[in-house]
C-alpha cells in the first residue's frame, strides 16, 4: 500500500526514466529539420565527423542526439522508415545497457539501428544477436543499406561459414549472428594454436534480440565443444531392455520399483527397485552374484540404468524430440524449434537412441564449454529487446545487472484479452477450441492457435481436418516454412496452429504480409517483367480490401490450448495480436488434465471445480481459478529461477578457472618471447620436486634422495648424483640443491636453444605448451563434471554442497595448474635435439590446426616417446609423411636448414629430416 502511494506521488522508476529520455527525444527532434536540409554527401560525412570527435575525447553520450538524428534521417532516405519518438527512447535504453520491453510490431529491428550506429562509431565492433540464422540474415539484409549509406560495414555469422569468412564478418563494424554461433566462436578461439586463426575481436557491445528467450529460456543450456569418448555402445542396447521389466510407482510412497517426479524431471529408484534391477542385471550376466550396483566397479552400470529409465519415463517422441533422417533431434521446449546438432549429455541421448532403435553414437567428452549466462557477461556492455521482459525483470537485474524499461506503444493497444475457459477434460477443451476456430473462420477472422508440444499441434490439426477447416501447422517439423506461414497468418480466415512461440521475429500483418508476397513474385523467373508488374499491382489493390475485412472481423484472434509454466510465454503468444494499434483478441482454453494444473494447482482447483460442478462441455470462468493458475505459474517461475541461479553459482566456479586458463593461453599465443615464462616454469617445477623429496624444515634422515634422482632422470633426463653432493659438502641444503639443479637444466636448455635457433625453439615451446594446456584442461573439465554430479550427496553429511564444490574445485584447479607446469617442463627439457645430414625438400603449409585438438595424444604417453615421435604427433596429428623419400615422390623440396613443413618450428634436419 505504501509502495502504491509513493508511486502516485513520485512516479515509478520506469516513469522517471521515460521522463528523462523524453527530454533527449526533444533534443533529437529539434535537429530533424537541420538533418533533412543536408545533402546525401553531407549526411554521410557526419559519420567521419563523429569518429573524429570521439577521437578528440568526446563521449558517445555527448554525440547521441546528433547521431540519432543522423540515423533517423538516413533511415528515412534509404529504408523509407522514420523512427517514432518511442523508438528513439528504445534506442537510448539499448545504448544505456538496459533491456527495452517493446510490444510486438513496434519495430524492434529498426530501434536497434540507433544504438548500433552510435556504438559502432567507436570502432570496437557491435554484435546484434538473434535466435536463428534466418533472422540474422534477414535483419542484416534489411538494415545493410542504412549502415552502408552511413559508411559502416555489416557482417553476418551463420552456422556453415568458413573461418576466413567469419574473420571478415567479425572485422565489420556491425556483426549479426545467433547466440550459438557467437558463443561457439568464443570457445573455438580459445582452442586455436595460432593467434591469426582467431575470428572474434574483443567483446564490446551486444544487442540481444528476443533477450528473454536467450538469457532466460536457454540459460541452463551450456554451449559445449566435445570430442568422442570411449564408450560401450552395446551396453546402451542391453540396458534399454531393463526399464520394461521394472514397475512404475503410482505415488511416491506406493508399491513399485521407481517413482517419476515430473515436477523435478527426475526418476528415483526405490529400495525394492534397486534389488529388482540387480536381479535382472545378474541374470543378464552384467552383475556378479551378491554384487551391488552401489559398488565402485559398477558405477558405469548404474549410470546406464538411470539413463535408460529417464529415456523411457521422461523423454517422449514429438514432445522432447523427433526422429529425422534416422537421428534423434532435440525439440526446444520453449520455442518448439528443432535443435539440430545438439545432444543431451550424461548418456541420455544414447539411451533415447537405443529406445527408438536408431543408430547409437558415442558419448562425447567435453573439450570446452560455457553457459550463455557467463558468455554474455563477458561483453563490456550488454543490452536487449523483447516484447515480454517485465515478469523476469528481477532475474535480469540480479544475474545480468540489466534493468528493464517498459517502452510505451506508439498507438494504444486495442486487443481484448478474454478470461480463461476451464474444462474437466482435455477432450472437452479441444472440442471448444475447434468450435471457437470454426466461428472465427466463418466471419473471416484469422486465428493463431498456440500449443505447448508437437503432439498437441498435430492433435489440433487432426481435429481441424475432421471439421473440414483448412489450416497451416507450424512446429519443429515445419521449420523451413516457418517465416512464410507466420507472414501469411493474418489473411482473411487463415488458421495457423503453432507450437509454443515458433515464428517469433516475424510480424503477423492483418490481410497478409504484402512484402513477402511481392518479393515472391519478383523472384519468380518464369514471369516476364510485365507479368510481374501486373500481378503486383493486382495484389496491392486486393490487399487493402482484405486488410479492411480482417479489421472488421476483429483482427487476429489468439487461442492458447494450455497455460505455459511461465506467464511470459503466455504473454508472448497474446502479443502476436494487436500490433501497432490493430484490433485483436485472445483466450486460453484449459483442462484439469493439463500438466500445469495437474502438477501444481490440482488440489485447490479440484475443490473449486467440485463446488461449481459444471456439466460436460460447459466451461468454468472464475476469478478464484484464474488466481490459482497464476499462483501455480509464479511458483514454477520461482523454481525455474532458482534452478538457473544454481546453475550460475556452480558455473561461476568453473568460469573463474576458465578465465585464468584462457588468459594464460592467450598470453602464450600473443607473446613473441616466452623464454622468461619457460624459465619460471622450469624453476617452479624443480623447486616443487625437490620440496617433495626434501621437505623444508625436515631432518636429513627424512629425505628420499634416491627417488629424487630417479624422478629427475626419468622426467627431465637429468642424471645428477645428489648423494655425492651431500657427502662432499655437509652444509648443503635443499635450497642449494634447487639452485644447482636449475643451473644444470638452464645450461642444457640453452645449448638446445642455440642448436635449433631461438625463434624455432620459441615456436616449438609455444605449440607444446598449448597442447599440454588443452589436454589437461579437457581432463579437468571431465573431473569437474563428475564432482558436480555427486556433490549433492555431501548434504547427507550435513555439509553445504556449494561450499564443498568450491573448496574441492579450488584444490583441483591448483593440481591442474601444477600438472600443466610439470608436463610442459618435463616434455621440453627431455626433448633430444640431433643433427643428421638430410635430403632437401620444399616447404608446404601446415595442415588443419583444429585436428590437433580432436586427435591430441595423451601427455603421459608422449613422455615415453622418442623426440621424432613427439614431433610427429604434436605437430602432424593427421600422420602426413614428411620423410625425404615421401616429399621427393611428391616433387617437393626443402633445404636442410629450412623449417620443417610439419609446423614444429624446428629445422627440417632436426625434425622429420633426421629420419633419413
UniProtKB/Swiss-Prot annotation:
User: What cofactor is needed?
Assistant: Zn(2+)
Keyword terms of this UniProt record: ATP-binding, Cell inner membrane, Cell membrane, Cytoplasm, Membrane, Metal-binding, Nucleotide-binding, Protein transport, Translocase, Translocation, Transport, Zinc
**GO CC, alphabetical:** cell envelope Sec protein transport complex; cytosol; plasma membrane
Q: Where is this chain's protein located in or outside the cell?
A: Cell inner membrane; Cytoplasm
The record, for SMART domains, names: SecA_DEAD (SM00957), SecA_PP_bind (SM00958)
* Reaction catalyzed: ATP + H2O + cellular proteinSide 1 = ADP + phosphate + cellular proteinSide 2
**Bilayer topology:** Peripheral membrane protein
Identify the residues that bind ATP. 87, 105-109, 507
Its function?
Part of the Sec protein translocase complex. Interacts with the SecYEG preprotein conducting channel. Has a central role in coupling the hydrolysis of ATP to the transfer of proteins into and across the cell membrane, serving both as a receptor for the preprotein-SecB complex and as an ATP-driven molecular motor driving the stepwise translocation of polypeptide chains across the membrane.
Q: Which family does it belong to?
A: Belongs to the SecA family.
Q: How does it assemble?
A: Monomer and homodimer. Part of the essential Sec protein translocation apparatus which comprises SecA, SecYEG and auxiliary proteins SecDF-YajC and YidC.
Q: What is this protein called?
A: Protein translocase subunit SecA
Q: Which organism is it from?
A: Neisseria meningitidis serogroup C (strain 053442)
Give the encoding gene's name.
secA
Amino acid at each position: 500500500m505504501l509502495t502504491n502511494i509513493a508511486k502516485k506521488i513520485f512516479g515509478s522508476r520506469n516513469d522517471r526514466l521515460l521522463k528523462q529520455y523524453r527530454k533527449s527525444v526533444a533534443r533529437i527532434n529539434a535537429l530533424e529539420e537541420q538533418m533533412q536540409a543536408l545533402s546525401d554527401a553531407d549526411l554521410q560525412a557526419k559519420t567521419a565527423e563523429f569518429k573524429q570527435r570521439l577521437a578528440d575525447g568526446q563521449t558517445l553520450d555527448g554525440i547521441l542526439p546528433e547521431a540519432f538524428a543522423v540515423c533517423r534521417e538516413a533511415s528515412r532516405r534509404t529504408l523509407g522508415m522514420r523512427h517514432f519518438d518511442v523508438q528513439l527512447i528504445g534506442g537510448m535504453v539499448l545504448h544505456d545497457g538496459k533491456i527495452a520491453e517493446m510490444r510486438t510490431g513496434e519495430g524492434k529491428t529498426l530501434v536497434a539501428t540507433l544504438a548500433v550506429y552510435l556504438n559502432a562509431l567507436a570502432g570496437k565492433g557491435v554484435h546484434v544477436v538473434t535466435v536463428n540464422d534466418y533472422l540474422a540474415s534477414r535483419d542484416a539484409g534489411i538494415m545493410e543499406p542504412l549502415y552502408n549509406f552511413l559508411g559502416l560495414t555489416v557482417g553476418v555469422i551463420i552456422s556453415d561459414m568458413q573461418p576466413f569468412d567469419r574473420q571478415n564478418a567479425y572485422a565489420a563494424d556491425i556483426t549479426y549472428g545467433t547466440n550459438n554461433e557467437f558463443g561457439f566462436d568464443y570457445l573455438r578461439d580459445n582452442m586455436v594454436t595460432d593467434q591469426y586463426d582467431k575470428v572474434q575481436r574483443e567483446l564490446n557491445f551486444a544487442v540481444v534480440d528476443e533477450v528473454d528467450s536467450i538469457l532466460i529460456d536457454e540459460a541452463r543450456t551450456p554451449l559445449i565443444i566435445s570430442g568422442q569418448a570411449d564408450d560401450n555402445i552395446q551396453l546402451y542396447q542391453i540396458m534399454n531392455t531393463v526399464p520394461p521389466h521394472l514397475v512404475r510407482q503410482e505415488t511416491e510412497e506406493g508399491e513399485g520399483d521407481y517413482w517419476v517426479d515430473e515436477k523435478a524431471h527426475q526418476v528415483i529408484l526405490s529400495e525394492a527397485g534397486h534389488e529388482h534391477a540387480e536381479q535382472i542385471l545378474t541374470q543378464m550376466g552384467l552383475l556378479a552374484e551378491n554384487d551391488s550396483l552401489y559398488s565402485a566397479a559398477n558405477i558405469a552400470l548404474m549410470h546406464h540404468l538411470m539413463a535408460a529409465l529417464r529415456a523411457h519415463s521422461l523423454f517422449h517422441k514429438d514432445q522432447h524430440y523427433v526422429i529425422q533422417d534416422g537421428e534423434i533431434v532435440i525439440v526446444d521446449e520453449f520455442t518448439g524449434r528443432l535443435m539440430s546438432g545438439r545432444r543431451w549429455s550424461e548418456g541420455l541421448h544414447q539411451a533415447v537412441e537405443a529406445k527408438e532403435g536408431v543408430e547409437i553414437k558415442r558419448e562425447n567428452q567435453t573439450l570446452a564449454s560455457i553457459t550463455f549466462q557467463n558468455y554474455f557477461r563477458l561483453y563490456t556492455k550488454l543490452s536487449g529487446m523483447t516484447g515480454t521482459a517485465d515478469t523476469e525483470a528481477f532475474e535480469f537485474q540480479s544475474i545480468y545487472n540489466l534493468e528493464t524499461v517498459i517502452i510505451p506503444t506508439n498507438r494504444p493497444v486495442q486487443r481484448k484479452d478474454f478470461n480463461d475457459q476451464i474444462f474437466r477434460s482435455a477432450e472437452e477443451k479441444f472440442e471448444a477450441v475447434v468450435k471457437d476456430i470454426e466461428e472465427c473462420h466463418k466471419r473471416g477472422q484469422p486465428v493463431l492457435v498456440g500449443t505447448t508440444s508437437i503432439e498437441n499441434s498435430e492433435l489440433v490439426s487432426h481435429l481441424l481436418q475432421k471439421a473440414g477447416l483448412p489450416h497451416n501447422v507450424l512446429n519443429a517439423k515445419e521449420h523451413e516454412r516457418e517465416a512464410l506461414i507466420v507472414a501469411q497468418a493474418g489473411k482473411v480466415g487463415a488458421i495457423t496452429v503453432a507450437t509454443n512461440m515458433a515464428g517469433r521475429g516475424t510480424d503477423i500483418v492483418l490481410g497478409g504480409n504484402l512484402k513477402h508476397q511481392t518479393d515472391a513474385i519478383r523472384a519468380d523467373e518464369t514471369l516476364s517483367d510485365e507479368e510481374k508488374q501486373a500481378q503486383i499491382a493486382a495484389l496491392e489493390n486486393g490487399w487493402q480490401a482484405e486488410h479492411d475485412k480482417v479489421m472488421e472481423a476483429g483482427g487476429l484472434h489468439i487461442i492458447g490450448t494450455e497455460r505455459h509454466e511461465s506467464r511470459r510465454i503466455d504473454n508472448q503468444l497474446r502479443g502476436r495480436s494487436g500490433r501497432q494499434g490493430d484490433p485483436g483478441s485472445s483466450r486460453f482454453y484449459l483442462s484439469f488434465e493439463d500438466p500445469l494444473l495437474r502438477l501444481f494447482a490440482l488440489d485447490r482447483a479440484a475443490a473449486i471445480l467440485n463446488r461449481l460442478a459444471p456439466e460436460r462441455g460447459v466451461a468454468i470462468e472464475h476469478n478464484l481459478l484464474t488466481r490459482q493458475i497464476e499462483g501455480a505459474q509464479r511458483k514454477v517461475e520461482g523454481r525455474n529461477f532458482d534452478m538457473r541461479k544454481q546453475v550460475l553459482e556452480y558455473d561461476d566456479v568453473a568460469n573463474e578457472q576458465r578465465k585464468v586458463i584462457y588468459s594464460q593461453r592467450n598470453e602464450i599465443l600473443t607473446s613473441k618471447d616466452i623464454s622468461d615464462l619457460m624459465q619460471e616454469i622450469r624453476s617452479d617445477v624443480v623447486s616443487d620436486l625437490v620440496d617433495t623429496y626434501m621437505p623444508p624444515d625436515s631432518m636429513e634422515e627424512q629425505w628420499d634422495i634416491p627417488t629424487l634422482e630417479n624422478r629427475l632422470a626419468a622426467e627431465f633426463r637429468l642424471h645428477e648424483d645428489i648423494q655425492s653432493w651431500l657427502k662432499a659438502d655437509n652444509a648443503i641444503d635443499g635450497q642449494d640443491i634447487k639452485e644447482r639443479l636449475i643451473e644444470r637444466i638452464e645450461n642444457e636448455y640453452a645449448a638446445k636453444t642455440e642448436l635449433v635457433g631461438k625463434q624455432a625453439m620459441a615456436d616449438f615451446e609455444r605449440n607444446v605448451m598449448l597442447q599440454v594446456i588443452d589436454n589437461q584442461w579437457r581432463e579437468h573439465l571431465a573431473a569437474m563434471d563428475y564432482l558436480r554430479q555427486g556433490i549433492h550427496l555431501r548434504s547427507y553429511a550435513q555439509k553445504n554442497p556449494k561450499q564443498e564444490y568450491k573448496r574441492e574445485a579450488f584444490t583441483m584447479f591448483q593440481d591442474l595448474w601444477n600438472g600443466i607446469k610439470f608436463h610442459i617442463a618435463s616434455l621440453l627439457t627431455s626433448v633430444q635435439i640431433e643433427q643428421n645430414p638430410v635430403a632437401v625438400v620444399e616447404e608446404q603449409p601446415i595442415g588443419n590446426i583444429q585436428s590437433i585438438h580432436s586427435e591430441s595424444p595423451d601427455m603421459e604417453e608422449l613422455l615415453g616417446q622418442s623426440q621424432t615421435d613427439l614431433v610427429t604427433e604434436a605437430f602432424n596429428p593427421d600422420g602426413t609423411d614428411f620423410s625425404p623419400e615421401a616429399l621427393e615422390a611428391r616433387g617437393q623440396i626443402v633445404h636442410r636448414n629450412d623449417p620443417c613443413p610439419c609446423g614444429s618450428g624446428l629445422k627440417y634436419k632436426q625434425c622429420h629430416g633426421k629420419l633419413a
